[in-house]
C-alpha cells in the first residue's frame, strides 16, 4: 500500500475536472463502519513523539461493563467482515478481512508521525471518527504542510468526506460555498452532514518550539508545559 507503483495507479484514476461513477473505481469489496474511537498526539521534551489511536469499535463497545474494573469491553470482533453479509450496494465483503487465527481486523485508524529529511519530527497527527479518519487526517496534513495553515487552522478548517460506497461527498455545514459549488461542477453529489466529520488532534514543530491543536468539534483543548 505504501509503494510508489500502487500510489501511481491510484493517482492515474483521478480526474481534476470530474468525478466518475462507482464502477469506474472498480470497488471489489466493502468494509464495515467503525466508531467508538479516541486519538492522542504527544511530543516529549527530548523530541520523541507518539501518535496513538485506540478504539472499542462501536459506541460503548459491546455495551458490557466489567463489574470489577468498570472498564467497558470492546466488540472489536465486529470489525471483521462476515462471509454471509453483502452491503446495500451489492458489494461483497473483503476476504482480506475474514476472521482467521491470530489476525487483526482491518481498520480506518492511521496514527501518523511526519518526519523531515533531517530526521526531525515535523508533525504528529491522527483522528477519531470511523471511516472518516483517513480523509480527516490527510486533510489536516495537506492544510498544514502543503497550504501552510497553522495547526489550529488546519484542524478547524471545515472538512469533506467521500468513501465511494455510498458515492456521496459529505460536507460540513460551515464549508465555503465555493468548495461545494466546485464539487458539484465536477459532478459530485454533495450532502451536508448533520453533525461533523471526524475529530483530529495534531502537534506541529515551529521555529521556536511546538504548536498543538485539539479539535473543538468535540470540545478538546491541547495541554503542554
Swiss-Prot record:
Alphabetical list of PROSITE patterns matching this protein: G_GLU_TRANSPEPTIDASE
Gene Ontology MF terms in the entry: glutathione hydrolase activity
A Pfam family: G_glu_transpept
Further remark: Corresponds to the light chain of other gamma-glutamyltransferase family members. Has no catalytic activity.
Domain of life: Eukaryota
Family per similarity comment: Belongs to the gamma-glutamyltransferase family.
InterPro entries per the UniProt record, alphabetical: GGT_CS, GGT_peptidase, GGT_ssub, Ntn_hydrolases_N
Binding residues annotated for L-glutamate, in chain numbering: 55, 76, 107-108, 129-130
Active site: 37
Coiled-coil regions, chain positions: none
Protein name (database record): Glutathione hydrolase light chain 1
Gene3D superfamilies in the record: 3.60.20.40
GO biological process: glutathione catabolic process; leukotriene D4 biosynthetic process
Amino acid at each position: 500500500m505504501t509503494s510508489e507503483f500502487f500510489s501511481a495507479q491510484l493517482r492515474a484514476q483521478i480526474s481534476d475536472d470530474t468525478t466518475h461513477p462507482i464502477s469506474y473505481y472498480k470497488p471489489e469489496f466493502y468494509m464495515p463502519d467503525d466508531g467508538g474511537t479516541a486519538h492522542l498526539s504527544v511530543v516529549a521534551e527530548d523530541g520523541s513523539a507518539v501518535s496513538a489511536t485506540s478504539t472499542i469499535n462501536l459506541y460503548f463497545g459491546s455495551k458490557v461493563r466489567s463489574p470489577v474494573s468498570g472498564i467497558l469491553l470492546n466488540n472489536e470482533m465486529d470489525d471483521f467482515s462476515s462471509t454471509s453479509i453483502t452491503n446495500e450496494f451489492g458489494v461483497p465483503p473483503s476476504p482480506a478481512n475474514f476472521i482467521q487465527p491470530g489476525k487483526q481486523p482491518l481498520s480506518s485508524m492511521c496514527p501518523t508521525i511526519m518526519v523531515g529529511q533531517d530526521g526531525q519530527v515535523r508533525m504528529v497527527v491522527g483522528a477519531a471518527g470511523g471511516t472518516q479518519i483517513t480523509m480527516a487526517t490527510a486533510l489536516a496534513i495537506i492544510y498544514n504542510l502543503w497550504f501552510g495553515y497553522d495547526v489550529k487552522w488546519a484542524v478547524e478548517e471545515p472538512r469533506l468526506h467521500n468513501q465511494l460506497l455510498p458515492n456521496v461527498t459529505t460536507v460540513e455545514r460551515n464549508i465555503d460555498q465555493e468548495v461545494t459549488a466546485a464539487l458539484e461542477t465536477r459532478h459530485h453529489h454533495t450532502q451536508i452532514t448533520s453533525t461533523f466529520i471526524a475529530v483530529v488532534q495534531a502537534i506541529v514543530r515551529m521555529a521556536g518550539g511546538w504548536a498543538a491543536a485539539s479539535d473543538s468539534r468535540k470540545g478538546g483543548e491541547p495541554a503542554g508545559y
